[in-house]
């Protein structure tokens, strides 16, 4: 099946044609590890996790690289304010990021380079840019000369005047042009730094991704992804550095960007009091519900995070897991991902359409009457879920929360009450049976009576 993706560079949806059909290479900008991941950080992780899963279905080998930015002024400021070391902050934040993303069903990338482990690559790249006349040293800094690249601004579509006026550009006296940006900056004794031909210092943000993508994917690769907010200046500057260093026609062939995130219709910010971390939400709802909620909106569209949307996603998963629990004793027939789901995802990751196909598959499973039909429908549904990163858990665990000692105790109490209710109904003591149902409802337990008996789930 042919994959079509929207290329930010050309502003059109194109047929994806990899440089090497035997090996697709993908780079995505990762987190700056100074604080807990918020839901805005989670969206690109989920989007490009799905893209990597899809690419692996279509091509024999995929290398997915997502970096960790562990040298940055925000990290320095957090260390200074907290009294902790930079290493303590970055190690802890990276670990927590991994834990949070795993709960969202995101698979780890194939390579996750840290900026601090690739300073030598950055220094070498800066040296080449200086040698080619695209960068210059000034007062301990090294800056990229934006006017030296005639095609600068091609990704964002901005003119030089627009970029200077719209960007928060530090117009320092040592800059030859106001748009020039930092590749290397000096560090005093209080800041992290590495020896370089220009003295002790640290890299600028943009050179980090250029160096790491080239290190692991080569000077030219297939797809570069990230959030819409990174188009300018970060991705624009990555292109400038990489193309001027490695030559015309190099760097990423396709650019993919996910849309902005809102919270209850407003921009997320600490000043508005609606800053939500992934952990905040994981304390309230399963990560799988968060994943489904995000997949319900096309990745290029703005996503409005709402409590109602999260609840709808949870209810949708309840329906899916309830159906899977009803056929728990039937082995799923081996199945490929259904064509409708694949076609939707190959159409620029059209997840709303793919999920509509999933709910159609759910209907097929619910209508199946023979064991053969149920096995086939179950296999198709699970295959679709495996690609989407959904409903791969034990239905009993999802619906009833089995696992911990406390949850097992709850399950035992519920099962006992279900037995009492069954006995009351057999004795035609319907008042007692209804009272038990009401008691369970008040405890957040939903009963579902079926031809094979009564099952239950948490509301």
Curated annotation (Swiss-Prot):
Keywords: Aminoacyl-tRNA synthetase, ATP-binding, Cytoplasm, Ligase, Metal-binding, Nucleotide-binding, Protein biosynthesis, Zinc
Binding annotation for Zn(2+): 29, 209, 234, 238
Record GO biological process: cysteinyl-tRNA aminoacylation
Family that this chain belongs to: Belongs to the class-I aminoacyl-tRNA synthetase family.
Motif 'HIGH' region mapped to chain: 31-41
Gene (name only): cysS
UniProt protein name: Cysteine--tRNA ligase
Entry keyword annotation includes Transmembrane helix: no
UniProt-listed SMART domains: DALR_2 (SM00840)
Organism name: Rhodospirillum rubrum (strain ATCC 11170 / ATH 1.1.1 / DSM 467 / LMG 4362 / NCIMB 8255 / S1)
Cofactor note: Binds 1 zinc ion per subunit.
Motif 'KMSKS' region per UniProt: ranges: 267-271
Entry coiled-coil feature ranges: none
One Pfam family it belongs to: DALR_2
Localization terms from the record: Cytoplasm
Catalytic reactions of this protein: tRNA(Cys) + L-cysteine + ATP = L-cysteinyl-tRNA(Cys) + AMP + diphosphate
Binding positions for ATP per the UniProt entry: 270
GO molecular function: ATP binding; cysteine-tRNA ligase activity; zinc ion binding
Domain of life according to the entry: Bacteria
Subunit annotation: Monomer.
């Amino acid at each position: 099946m042919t994959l079509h993706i929207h290329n930010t560079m050309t502003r059109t949806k194109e047929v994806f044609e990899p440089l090497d059909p035997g090996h697709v290479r993908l780079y995505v900008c990762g987190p700056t590890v100074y604080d807990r991941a918020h839901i805005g950080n989670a969206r690109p992780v989920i989007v490009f996790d799905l893209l990597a899963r899809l690419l692996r279905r279509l091509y024999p080998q995929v290398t997915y690289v997502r970096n960790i930015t562990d040298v940055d002024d925000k990290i320095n400021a957090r260390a200074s304010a907290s009294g902790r070391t930079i290493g303590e902050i970055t190690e802890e934040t990276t670990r927590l990021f991994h834990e949070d993303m795993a709960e969202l069903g995101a698979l780890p990338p194939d390579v996750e380079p840290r900026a601090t482990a690739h300073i030598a690559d950055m220094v070498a790249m800066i040296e080449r840019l200086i040698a080619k006349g695209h960068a210059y040293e000034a007062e301990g800094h090294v800056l990229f000369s934006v006017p030296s690249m005639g095609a600068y601004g091609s990704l964002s579509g901005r003119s030089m005047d627009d970029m200077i006026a719209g960007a928060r550009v530090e117009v320092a006296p040592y800059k030859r042009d106001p748009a020039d940006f930092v590749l290397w900056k000096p560090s005093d004794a209080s800041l992290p730094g590495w020896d370089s031909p220009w003295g002790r210092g640290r890299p600028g943000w943009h050179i980090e991704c250029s160096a790491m993508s080239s290190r692991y994917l080569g000077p030219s690769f297939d797809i570069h992804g990230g959030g819409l907010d990174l188009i300018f200046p970060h991705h624009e500057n990555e292109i400038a550095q990489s193309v001027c260093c490695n030559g015309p026609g190099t760097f990423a062939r396709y650019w993919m960007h996910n849309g902005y995130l809102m919270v209850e219709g407003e921009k997320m910010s600490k000043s508005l009091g609606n800053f939500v971390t992934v952990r905040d939400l994981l304390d309230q709802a399963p990560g799988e519900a968060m994943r489904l909620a995000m997949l319900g909106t096309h990745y290029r569209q703005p996503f409005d995070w709402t409590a109602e949307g999260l609840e709808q996603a949870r209810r949708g998963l309840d329906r899916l897991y309830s159906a899977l629990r009803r056929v728990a004793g039937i082995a799923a027939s081996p199945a490929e991902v259904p064509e409708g789901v694949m076609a939707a995802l190959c159409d620029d990751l059209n997840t709303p359409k793919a999920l509509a196909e999933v709910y159609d598959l759910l209907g097929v499973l619910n209508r199946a009457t023979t064991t053969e039909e149920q096995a086939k429908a179950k296999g198709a549904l699970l295959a679709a879920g495996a690609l989407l990163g959904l409903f791969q858990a034990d239905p009993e665990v999802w619906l009833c929360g089995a696992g911990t000692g406390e949850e097992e105790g709850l399950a035992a109490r519920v099962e006992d009450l279900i037995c009492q209710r069954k006995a009351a109904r057999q004795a035609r003591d319907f008042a007692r049976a209804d009272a038990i149902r009401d008691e369970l409802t008040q405890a957040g337990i939903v009963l579902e009576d079926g031809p094979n008996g009564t099952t239950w789930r948490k509301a």
